[in-house]
């Protein structure tokens, strides 16, 4: 692609999934205010994540990405951030030990406020209103006032993201991520799990390793008490994203400093569209959701547009096919990418292709289908001789009842007990950890 890029060049192209703000002058003022604020992350941090992505692409690390479907203003609290961060740490230690390689930890946090919708409107009875597009755009209440897009919400999202990042950095570097403590949390989980016998062997081996390190005097090393943690969200509201574009003083490259990583959704990946145009010019590591409608030729064009230098740390293909489709659609895409010599990080999003409506009316996901898609993702890569590099999940550290199934199964009738999501159903802490142990077993076999 030869046309020049600038932070606002996306504005000249067709754009999908954007709210209709009634007051353009108000929106412009808020955009200018955001642009004057300090960045949320720094270019050097995004460069470091890009380096770590390259390690994953080359098969020397594994990517764990998880967090909320859509962050909420009303439910924002230190406890919720802590609990999600804690579960991600617990998942990571299990995977690290089983795989024998570093696990790159990226949270869908501190910016995952906006959501694409299948329809621009929502109808209940004989009333039709604009769809809820996330707290950064409008309110979830089904009334005319709540559903009006409000630019002031962009500012509130920034301030919440700032507070979230401040807390996450403190957790990552302040001792909360101590390996011994994280392992103790996992032991507590195992003790109360229906699959305790299955997990004890791995837990005992981790115990022995930590005891050996303690005996060698290695238990006080900073690497055991601190961790690297990065943030990511879907780059959906481009006026918000543009406000955080900064030119790096060291390299001259542009970075979107709203998060370390950004991704393009399956609904906004048009080659001639604004979202691809915006992300092709920022030097963050980026992702693209790859659904069953993606064909091999389109995928190669997207890869070449977003990663023309074929840098192994630049592009994450996040596969979200559904358990019933991934086995049919993924092999052809992998073969084309390999044949064309493109370097990409393949990860599995087993959530978005497996959403169903329960008989009770709740939107849900079946844990068996989630696990089924992950297993097929690994099987396809093994058959093709390529590396299954990561997992991308919607989860929470809270004890919600939004996805059915699991070792302590949630039934369709039980969904209403603690169904709190503002958008799509999330795995709870127990389901997330169960998935981590099951992935760990697969990683152990793959990396022998």
What role is predicted for each listed range?
Residues 1-62:
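N-terminal basic/disordered segments at the start of proteins
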Residues 18-21, 53-66, 123-141:
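Short, compositionally biased low-complexity segments
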Residues 48-50, 272-275, 302, 331-333:
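Glycine-rich, charged/polar anion/phosphate-binding loops
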Residues 64-69, 106-109, 348-351, 394-396:
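Short loop/turn segments at strand-loop or loop-helix junctions that form parts
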Residues 173-178, 344, 348-352:
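An internal, amphipathic alpha-helical element
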């Amino acid at each position: 692609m030869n046309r020049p890029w600038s932070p606002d060049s996306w504005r000249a192209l067709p754009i999908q999934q954007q709210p209709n703000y009634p007051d353009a002058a108000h929106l412009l003022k808020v955009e200018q205010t955001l642009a004057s604020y300090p960045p949320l992350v720094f270019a050097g941090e995004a460069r470091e994540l890009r380096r770590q992505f390259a390690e994953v692409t080359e098969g020397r690390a594994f990517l764990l990405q998880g967090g909320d479907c859509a962050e909420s203003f009303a439910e924002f609290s230190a406890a919720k951030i802590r609990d999600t961060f804690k579960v991600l740490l617990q998942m990571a230690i299990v995977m690290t030990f089983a795989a024998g390689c570093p696990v790159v930890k990226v949270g869908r946090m501190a910016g995952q406020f906006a959501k694409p919708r299948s329809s621009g409107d929502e109808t209940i009875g004989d009333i039709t209103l604009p769809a809820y597009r996330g707290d950064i755009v409008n309110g979830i209440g089904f009334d005319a006032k709540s559903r009006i897009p409000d630019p002031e919400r962009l500012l509130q999202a920034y301030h919440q993201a700032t507070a979230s990042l401040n807390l996450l950095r403190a957790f990552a570097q302040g001792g909360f991520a101590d390996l011994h403590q994280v392992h103790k949390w996992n032991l507590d989980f195992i003790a109360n799990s229906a699959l305790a016998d299955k997990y004890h062997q791995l837990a005992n081996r981790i115990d022995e390793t930590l005891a050996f390190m303690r005996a060698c005097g290695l238990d006080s090393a900073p690497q055991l008490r601190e961790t690297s943690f990065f943030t990511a969200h879907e780059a959906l509201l481009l006026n918000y994203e543009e406000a955080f574009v900064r030119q790096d003083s060291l390299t001259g490259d542009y970075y979107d400093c709203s998060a370390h990583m950004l991704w393009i959704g399956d609904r906004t990946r048009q080659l001639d569209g604004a979202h691809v145009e915006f992300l092709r010019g920022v030097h963050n590591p980026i992702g693209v959701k790859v659904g069953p409608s993606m064909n091999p030729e389109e995928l190669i064009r997207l890869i070449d547009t977003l990663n023309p230098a074929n840098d192994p740390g630049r592009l994450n293909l996040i596969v979200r096919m559904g358990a019933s489709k991934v086995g049919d659609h993924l092999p052809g895409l992998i073969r084309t990418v390999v044949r064309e010599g493109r370097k990409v990080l393949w990860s599995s999003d087993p959530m978005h292709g497996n959403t169903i409506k329960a008989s009770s009316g709740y939107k849900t996901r079946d844990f068996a289908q989630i696990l089924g898609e992950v297993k097929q993702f690994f099987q396809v890569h093994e058959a093709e001789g390529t590396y299954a590099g990561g997992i991308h999940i919607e989860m929470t550290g809270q004890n919600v009842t939004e996805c059915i199934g699991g070792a302590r199964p949630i039934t369709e009738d039980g969904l209403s007990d603690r169904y709190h999501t503002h958008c799509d159903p999330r795995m709870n802490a127990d389901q997330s950890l169960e998935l981590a142990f099951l992935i760990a077993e697969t990683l152990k076999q793959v990396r022998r």
